[in-house]
Amino acid sequence: MIYQLHEFHKTVMAPAVVWADTTRHFFTNPLSPLAYTPVSRTISANSEMFVRLLRRYPKPEWGIDEVISNGERVTVTREIAIDKPFCQLLHFRKSLDVAQPKLLIVAPLSGHYATLLRDTVRTALVDHDVWITDWADAKMVPLAAGPFHLDDYVDYICEFIRALSPQLNVMSVCQPTVPVLGAVSLMASQNDPAVPKAMIMMGGPIDTRRNPTSVNDFAAGRPHSWFSDRVIMRVPGNYPGFMRKVYPGFLQHASFLAMNPDRHMNAHRQFYNHLIRGDGDSADAHRNFYDEYNAVLDMPAEYYLDTIKVVFQEFQLPKGNWSVRGSLVRPETIRKTALFTIEGELDDISGNGQTEAAQTLARNIPAEKRKHLLAKGLGHYGIFSGRKFRETVYPQIRNFIRLMSQREADLKLVRMR
C-alpha cells in the first residue's frame, strides 16, 4: 500500500510540479519581462525548490561522447554487448585502433543507477577498453522474467567475465565486491581458464564484522523477517514489473538521506542562496549532483534479502560457508588473479578493513600480485569519483593493471626461452 500511496502522491502533485516549473521559466527566461522584477529571483528560486522536491528523477544520461586517449581526442559510442533481463553489459567503444587493457567495471546494484560511476568510466576510458554492468530497475522487469537472487548476480558476473576474457581486469565498486569475489572464486576452483587477470575491489562489504558502520549495525540489528515484512513491496500496476516484489528505490533514497540529514539540508540551503544570488555555476553543480543522487531504482526483493542475510547478518563469505548453486565459495583457490583492494579513510558505509579482508580470504595469491590502498581523506564516493580519485586513486589502479600485464608478458618470455 505504501508504494501505491507514493505513486498516487507523485501523480496528484504532477500538475503542481508543471505549474511551478512554468513559473520558474517565466521568472528566469531573459525574454520574459517578469525576469527583471525585484522579486524574480526569489520567486524562481522557490519554484525550483518546489519542483526539485516533488518531481520524478529519471535515469540520467551517460553523457560520455568523447575522451582524450593515447594523446588524441576520440569519439565514444555506447553499445549493448550482452542483454539480460536484469542487466545490460555496456561497452564504451572508442574510435581508436590501439589495443588497450580490457576493464570490466561492475557497478553496484544498491539503489542508484550505474551512471553514478560516470566519472569512473570517463577516467578509465583514457587508458582502457571499458565495459560496465548497467543494472535494470526491477519495476521495469516483467514478472514473467522470474526472480533474481544473489546467486543469479554471481552467474551474471561469471557470464560477463567469460564473454570478455582473456586478459580481462575486473573492477568492483562497493556492493559487488562480494559477488565478484564469489564469481572469481568459483571460476578458480573449477580451473576455469577465463579467470580475470586482476581484480580491483573498492569500498566493499567483504567482512562487515570489521569496523562496522551504522549501515552494518542497522542490517545486523534486526531480524531477517523485519526486512521482508517492512520494506518489501509489490510494484504498482503502472509499471511493466506489476506485482513483482521489490525493495523500492524511494525507501533506499530515504535511507541515503537519513545517513547525513544535516549535510543534505545544508546543501539545499546553499543551493537556494546560490539561486537568490544568481550564482549559476554553483547552482548547476548542485543540480548535477542531486539529479544523479535522487535518481533511484528498485531492487529485486530476492536479491536484496539474500544480500542482507549472506553479507550483513551471517557473514557467510568471511566465515567460509557461502554456497552458490550448491558450490562452496572458496577464495583461497584464487592463485592466478591479482588483487588490489582500495578503501577510503573516511568511508562511513564500508568501514576500514572490510574490503581489505579479501586479502586474507584469497590467501594463496602470490605477494607480488597483491596491493592495498587506504586513501587518506576520502569517503565512500571519493574513492571512485571526483578530483582526488582522478589524481591519487586512479593512477594507482592504472599502474597496477599495467604492472600485472607486464609481469605476465615477462613470464611468457621466460617460458618461451
Regions found by a protein language model. Give the residues of each.
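Active-site nucleophile elbow and catalytic-triad environment of alpha/beta-hydrolase enzymes
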Residues: 312-331
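Conserved acidic catalytic loop of the alpha/beta-hydrolase fold
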Residues: 140-142, 152-169, 181-185
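Catalytic histidine-centered segment of alpha/beta-hydrolase-like enzymes
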Residues: 376-391
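Short beta-strand/loop motif that positions the catalytic acidic residue
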Residues: 334-335, 340-343, 347
